[in-house]
């Protein structure tokens, strides 16, 4: 809403837009359906829409934050956005957590740039306004993901960066020329890390065919006519053959040039246990088996390494927690997980393998050892005899 003040034409937050969205959402609910909205709004406005409008909102708040965490190997801004979302009353279960879509990687950061521009937050060992934080994060994203070191990603007006998830990863890893990529495994590992962040928390998980195939951006000369008007987003919309039906095609039936796929088609990946799709399948199996999508987020605790992120979720059933523990740094981490929600004596096990890893100590913590760009989904169970019968 604040972003629209003083503008001659606007849609996001306009009273007519809000009324129309609420009307559509109400009509869809009456026939047993649900809706989601993808307006880029402040957290406050997302909460307000959730009260009477669309059932779900696209998570434009944490999306640029997790890209920033990967680009800088520092999760401080991501932890700030996650905590602020919870504190302002937006349940992450009501959000659509997405990887790539058809648009740009937004860095408008409306909540900080406009809605709370004068509010003071602790960030990078200083007291900064929301506007200052937005400027800092935007500068980091532009520096790490575009420019001479990553010319395959392009800025899109003042809204964000035209890129694919794979080229966000490539730029974060310092790859300046996509033609020189010879370590697909490292890109795939970081891509899966981002998938784990989005899938291993309450809410809806979304991704695209560009993600599934590991698509790179198109050379800008291949879409010169389309970008002539300034819309650089066409470089991240490469044609791709999801099922491998026509491997010799050079463009789609609509004339969109075919892009380079790092991972291959779905049939190729399903035949390879180490592929992106197979590993994503394992992540989604854990998500479904433990009911993570409908869990309740309790805590985003402080971390022992700036590249770490820990999400604490309460699962259905007494005495069970799920922890999403991620290493956004391209380096090994030997650290600890600590949260007041972790009961001393609780058993910690790996949801993927079932192996027991640790016991929570009296400081509500346990040690973790994480390879670079690695993620874990952990089950924390309190022994039956230790459960409080009055709870």
Task: Locate predicted features.
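Short amphipathic alpha-helical segments and helix-helix/interface helices
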Residues: 21-25, 195, 336
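Loop/helix patches that line or flank the sugar-binding groove of alpha-linked glycan CAZymes
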Residues: 89, 95-100, 105-322, 328-335
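Short, loop-centered acidic/histidine patches that primarily coordinate divalent metals
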Residues: 212, 326-329, 351-353, 373, ...
């Amino acid at each position: 809403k604040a972003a629209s003040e003083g503008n001659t034409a606007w849609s996001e937050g306009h009273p007519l837009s809000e009324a129309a969205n609420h009307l559509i959402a109400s009509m869809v609910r009456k026939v047993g359906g649900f809706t989601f909205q993808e307006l880029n709004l402040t957290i406050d406005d997302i909460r307000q829409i959730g009260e009477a409008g669309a059932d779900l909102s696209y998570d434009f708040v944490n999306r640029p934050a997790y890209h920033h965490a990967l680009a800088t190997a520092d999760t401080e801004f991501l932890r700030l956005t996650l905590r602020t979302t919870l504190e302002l009353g937006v349940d992450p279960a009501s959000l659509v957590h997405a990887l790539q879509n058809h648009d740009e990687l937004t860095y408008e950061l409306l909540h900080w740039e406009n809605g709370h521009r004068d509010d003071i937050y602790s960030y990078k060992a200083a007291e900064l306004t929301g506007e200052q934080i937005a400027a800092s994060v935007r500068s980091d994203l532009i520096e790490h993901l575009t420019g001479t070191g990553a010319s395959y990603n392009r800025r899109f007006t003042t809204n964000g960066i035209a890129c694919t998830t794979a080229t966000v990863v490539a730029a974060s890893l310092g790859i300046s020329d996509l033609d020189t990529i010879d370590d697909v495994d490292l890109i795939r590992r970081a891509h899966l890390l981002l998938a784990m962040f989005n899938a291993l928390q309450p809410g809806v998980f979304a991704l695209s065919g560009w993600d599934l195939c590991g698509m790179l951006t198109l050379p800008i000369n291949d879409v010169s006519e389309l970008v002539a008007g300034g819309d650089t987003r066409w470089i991240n919309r490469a044609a791709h053959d999801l099922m491998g039906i026509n491997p010799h095609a050079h463009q789609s039936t609509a004339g969109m040039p075919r892009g380079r796929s790092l991972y291959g088609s779905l049939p190729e990946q399903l035949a390879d246990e180490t592929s992106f799709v197979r590993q994503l399948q394992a992540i989604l199996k854990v998500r479904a088996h433990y009911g993570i999508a409908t869990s309740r987020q309790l805590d985003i605790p402080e971390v022992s390494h700036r590249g770490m992120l820990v999400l604490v979720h309460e699962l259905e059933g007494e005495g069970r927690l799920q922890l999403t523990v991620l290493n956004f740094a391209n380096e090994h981490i030997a650290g600890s997980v600590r949260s007041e929600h972790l009961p001393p004596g609780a058993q910690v096990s790996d949801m993927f393998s079932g192996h027991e890893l640790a016991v929570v100590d009296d400081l509500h913590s346990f040690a973790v050892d994480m390879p670079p760009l690695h993620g874990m989904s952990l089950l924390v169970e309190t022994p039956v005899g230790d459960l409080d019968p009055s709870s």
